[in-house]
UniProtKB/Swiss-Prot annotation:
One of its GO terms (biological process) is translation. The gene is rpmI. Pfam families: Ribosomal_L35p. The lineage of its organism: Bacteria, Pseudomonadati, Pseudomonadota, Alphaproteobacteria, Hyphomicrobiales. The keyword Translocase does not apply. Belongs to the bacterial ribosomal protein bL35 family. It comes from Rhizobium rhizogenes (strain K84 / ATCC BAA-868). Keywords: Ribonucleoprotein, Ribosomal protein. GO terms for cellular component: cytosolic large ribosomal subunit. InterPro entries: Ribosomal_bL35, Ribosomal_bL35-like, Ribosomal_bL35_CS, Ribosomal_bL35_sf. The keyword Ribosomal protein applies. This is Large ribosomal subunit protein bL35. One of its GO terms (molecular function) is structural constituent of ribosome.
Length: 67
């Protein structure tokens, strides 16, 4: 059976750290910023580490060969 391909969209959205955790940009920042608190906007500015179960799903289904 051939190797599973890495999903191109996942390559652009996720990064795997050296310890195997998955980093992604914070969600909820496309529009509607007026109603959001300043704390939310500040905290969502950078990247965040996904929860362990979500990270495992991303690696298994979308990034089988790592990055």
């Amino acid at each position: 059976m051939p190797k599973m391909k890495t999903k191109s969209s996942a390559k652009k959205r996720f990064k795997i750290t050296a310890t195997g955790k998955v980093k992604a940009a914070a969600a909820g920042k496309r529009h509607g910023m007026i109603k959001r608190s300043n704390k939310f906007i500040r905290d969502a500015r950078g990247t965040m580490v996904l929860a362990e179960p979500d990270g495992r799903k991303v690696i298994k289904n979308y990034l089988p060969n790592g990055l």
